[in-house]
Amino acid sequence: MTEHTPHDASRRDLLAAAAAMSLAAGAPAAAEQPSSPARAMAGKPSIVFAHGLWADGSCFSKLVPTLQAEGHEVICSQHGLDSLSGDVDCVVRCFGQVSGPIVLVGHSYGGTLITHAGVDPRVAALVYLCALAPDETETSQSLQAKFPATPVFGHIAVTDGRIWLKRDGTPDFCGDLSPADQKLVWATQAVPVPDLFTQKHDGVAWKSKPSWYVVGKQDRTVNPELERFVAKRMNATTVELDSSHVPMLSQPAAVLDVIRHAARSIKT
């Protein structure tokens, strides 16, 4: 005899409702791209964000409302930091939720993600924020190893199979934010598996896509010299800010200007 719990019933109700909605819309509608109102915004490029370690999509919260108000479709990937390939796939899935062409923006490890995901033909431009940008022979780790380690790595702990940023590490991660905002950053951190930075993936988008790069001159998480190195290597339009590792939170107006320049370069 099979016992049905209230949870089972709720799940059946949810599945039934989803099936009914699909039938009501018709099978072709399920595969449609964004709706007509969304396509009405297609005169401007869409913006897709990819976060890094010890962050989630909310790290772009000071950018998203302004870009939306200016007529861009915007979405933030919420990847789990479980595997490089899985994170890249998560970013690519976001492309189907907006009308291209896409300005793909990556922060920190998110730069590795946009480097690989950005080879998708829907992506027209790349924006790197204090970000990694490995070549085809590099991993995130091997790229970092070419430069002196930064102070933040003295404030991490591996617990329960994840790498956590300790509370006392926030000054080296986001030290130009208020104490209250630093606490918020720590509380919303997404944490990676220990081997994430040693994993590899195909595709180097910055070799074929126009790129912009924001260097954080006071970055104590990704070495600013690494940032300058990869920006020069990709021939990026480069802006240096007197910021920590999180310029999108501490200097959002300047970061918005960079994204706008990238968007204006795209013919829609």
Where are these regions (language model features)?
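Conserved HGGG/HGGXW glycine-rich cap/lid loop of the alpha/beta-hydrolase fold
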Residues: K44-L84
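Catalytic active-site module of serine/aspartate enzymes centered on a nucleophile-bearing elbow/loop
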Residues: S244-T268
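Conserved loop-alpha-helix segment in the C-terminal half of the alpha/beta-hydrolase fold
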Residues: K217-L241
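Flexible "cap/lid" loop of the alpha/beta hydrolase fold
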Residues: R122-V123, V127-T159, K166, V193
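N-terminal secretory signal peptides
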Residues: M1-A9, A17-L23
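Short beta-strand/loop motif that positions the catalytic acidic residue
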Residues: Y213-V215
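Gly/Ala-rich beta-loop-alpha elbow adjacent to hydrolase catalytic centers
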Residues: G106, G110, I114
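C-terminal segment of N-terminal export signals and the immediately downstream linker at the start
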Residues: G26-K44
